[in-house]
Amino acid sequence: MAKKVKGNRVQVVLECAEHKESGLPGTSRYITTKNKKNTTTRLELKKYNPILKKMTLHKEIK
């Protein structure tokens, strides 16, 4: 039997902040992982938004 390992790495969803405010249909979301021990705050990364066709700020959502 495999033992359960309680890890610090969790999956998080990043959603485009600029697209959300624009009111256009659709959403740009990315899934990534982060280490809860090292990164206690919410992630904010610049990622490519294919709907707006440019690099935008993506924030972690719950």
From Swiss-Prot:
Protein name: Large ribosomal subunit protein bL33
Source organism of this protein record: Azobacteroides pseudotrichonymphae genomovar. CFP2
GO MF term list: structural constituent of ribosome
Pfam families reported in the protein's UniProt record: Ribosomal_L33
Similarity-based family: Belongs to the bacterial ribosomal protein bL33 family.
Record lineage: Bacteria, Pseudomonadati, Bacteroidota, Bacteroidia, Bacteroidales
Disulfide bonds: none
Single GO cellular component term: cytoplasm
A biological process term (GO) from this entry: translation
Record's keyword annotation contains Ribosomal protein: yes
Keywords, in A-Z order: Ribonucleoprotein, Ribosomal protein
Keyword Chloroplast belongs to the record: no
Domain of life of the native organism: Bacteria
